[in-house]
């Protein structure tokens, strides 16, 4: 089971902003053109460590009531995509820290968005990338448009996979 999870995490790697940590290696094709701007890495090889799977995060506080309380939904889930992504990434960063990890340990970011409009991928990716850029790190990334998330007001959910030292 452990090998299967390791293999699955290695397969789903695809980018955001950075040079990798000691246990990660950014993989590029032999014909990689460094003049082309890529906001993510094509692949990340995990050389050692343990896989850390974060639950999907939202703009709601990490610890919130289930089922959701309407007043919390209205307080945190406004109609501002960038604000929801920022609050979500703040929660992701708190969870990474609690697990003894940092943004440089992230190997993959899944971004689920509802109500996609022209430019949403660029806007949401720019906010996500801003959390990795100071660490010169580009995790692999998957952007997906979905029909709906947990609440009608929810515009984004983000899940992260990281690798931490043994």
What residue ranges belong to the model's regions?
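N-terminal presequence-like segments and the immediate start of the first folded domain
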Residues: 4, 16-90, 94-99, 104-107, ...
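Sec-dependent signal peptide hydrophobic core
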Residues: 5-9
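Core hydrophobic alpha-helical transmembrane segments of single-pass membrane proteins
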Residues: 11-13
């Amino acid at each position: 089971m452990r090998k299967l999870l390791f293999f699955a995490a290695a397969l789903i790697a695809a980018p955001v902003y950075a040079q990798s940590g000691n246990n990660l290696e950014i993989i590029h094709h032999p014909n990689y053109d460094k003049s082309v701007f890529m906001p993510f890495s094509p692949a990340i090889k995990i050389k050692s460590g343990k896989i850390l799977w974060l639950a999907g995060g939202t703009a709601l506080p990490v610890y919130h009531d289930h089922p959701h309380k309407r007043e919390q939904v209205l307080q945190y889930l406004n109609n501002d995509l960038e604000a929801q992504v920022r609050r979500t990434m703040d929660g992701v960063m708190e969870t990474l820290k609690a697990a003894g990890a940092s943004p440089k340990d992230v190997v993959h970011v899944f971004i689920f968005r509802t109500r996609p409009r022209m430019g949403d991928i660029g806007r949401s990716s720019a906010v996500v990338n801003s959390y990795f850029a100071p660490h010169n790190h580009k995790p692999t990334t998957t952007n997906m448009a979905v029909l709906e998330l947990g609440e009608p007001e929810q515009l984004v959910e983000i899940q992260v996979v990281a690798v931490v030292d043994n």
